[in-house]
Amino acid sequence: MKVFITGASGFIGSAVLSELISSGHEVVGLARSDEAAAKIKSIDPAAKILRGDLKDLEILKKGATESDGVIHLGFVHDFKNFEQCCEIDRQATVAMLESLKGSNKPFLYTNGTLSLRPNKVANEQDGIDEDSKILRAVTEQVALSYKDKGVSARIVRLPFSVHGKGDKAFVPILMNIAKAAGKSGYVGQGTNAWAAVHRLDTAPLFRLVLEKGKTGQVYHCVGEQGIPFKDIARVIGEILNVPVASIPVDDAESHFGFLTCFVTRDGPVSSEGTRKELGWQPQQIGLLEDIRANYSLN
């Protein structure tokens, strides 16, 4: 199968690209720069390059129509302009979906579990939290609507933490916050749970959803259902040799900044349905072990 991947040079996309090629698929990766193109080629020389970015809608349409399937992993990670980034994502998604109408080709849209209702174990049948302000939740629903327009749309939801060597997201940011503050914090009792998955476990799941997934189905790429945030803070404290402390709710935003909505949220997520349907079984180490083994600020 010829597969077009956005975000192919990224933390998750690079693992997915390698997995697909090693499984016999032909991959075309979107590259916004010479650096991204070189990285894709360094991952696997067999990968082909399509130059452009998520704002180049005609390029995205070309990549989609000339492929047998699409995995949309690309996203502009600018948390200071998050709404604008979500709008870029929406337009890119719609452009590709429109170009695939009537083809019945698989289109995998990637969303996060932050848009699910908190304080319960969410499963694949759970819809988007109606109170969610995460704009990507709307794009997930738009993508699913194309199942009635001749596109085999499928959703893959990723947990709060996708971890592994090279991670530049939440855990490293939390470590920098802890170092600057002189303490590794959690909010209140710290019993709120984070779901997690290792980046190398995401790749087989995306391949299975591409090869065996069903139209209109949602899949959860979750290796660990829920890790108490206090445990994450404790391990970070051990690594940095700083005390672990509870941060009062009223002080959470001043301590954690834009991460406050994540560190205060209870978001356990089940992947039982995904595992049963596709036979996916995560093989890599868990988040806490990974932090101990592979995370530092050196």
From Swiss-Prot:
Pfam families: Epimerase. CDD domains: SDR_a7. It comes from the Eukaryota. Induction: Highly induced under sulfur starvation conditions. One of its GO terms (molecular function) is aldehyde dehydrogenase (NAD+) activity. One of its GO terms (cellular component) is cytoplasm. Belongs to the NAD(P)-dependent epimerase/dehydratase family. PANTHER family: PROTEIN YEEZ, PUTATIVE-RELATED. This is Uncharacterized protein YLL056C. It comes from Saccharomyces cerevisiae (strain ATCC 204508 / S288c) (Baker's yeast).
